[in-house]
Amino acid sequence: WNPEPAYFETEESLKEFVYDGFCGANLSKYMIEASKLDGKTLVCLKPCDTYSFNQLIKEHRVDREKAYIIGVGCRGKLDIEKIRETGIKGITDIKGAQIENEADTLTVETLYGEKTVEYKDAMLSRCHVCKGKEHKIYDELIGESRETKDADRFAEVEMIEAMSPEERFAFFRKELSKCIRCNACRNVCPACSCRKCVFDSTKFDSAQKANSDSFEEKMFHIIRAFHVAGRCTDCGECSRVCP
């Protein structure tokens, strides 16, 4: 229930193809390398992914003519950890996650019997603040979308703005202290697409993995924030992949 993005180049390999409610990855960034291949690459994009794809077109990082975009309907993407957080253990199968399924409840088969979980309670956090179900770019549309927004997109922003400078500094210091510098956020971010990344240089302390709470080691996040400011499409991939 944690499917990984993959390229399929033969008919035989397509037997391994999976696309269901657990396929939450934003595939637009993968089209940077796909644009360098001969011929067209078919890619499945959710509504929120198309914002990222359009941004990459503006930055000349992807070739629109090299992509055949299947706009896939979305009713929110699922997070297996959200299901486990409900206390369900020994999961063997999950029914209701197929994109053609419109059920409001997931049926979870376990070693200890059958359990049920509300679909909305198993969604990725970003889906609760979804900015819309309209595909901004596509060649073909399949499946139906369903509105999932049930929370204020700017509630956390308002909370931070209400803090004093000291409280705000403490808040961010606490959040960034959790970072293990695995680079997952950078690697998955569509806005982080430089051919050579500053964080791959050994000349900067910010290129090393964090081993203490020092401010300098948190420069990784400060630099990344400045680099993607004005280009971030709020796809939520950084939060999804962060361990």
Role assignments for model-derived ranges:
Residues 148-177, 191-243:
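Ferredoxin-type iron-sulfur electron-transfer modules in oxidoreductases and energy-metabolism complexes
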Residues 46-51, 124-134, 177-196, 230-243:
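Local cysteine-cluster metal-coordination motifs and their immediate loop/turn environment
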Residues 63-67, 79-82, 137-140, 186-195, ...:
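Generic marker of "main functional regions" within proteins
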Residues 1-172:
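Iron-sulfur-associated redox domains of electron-transfer enzymes in respiratory
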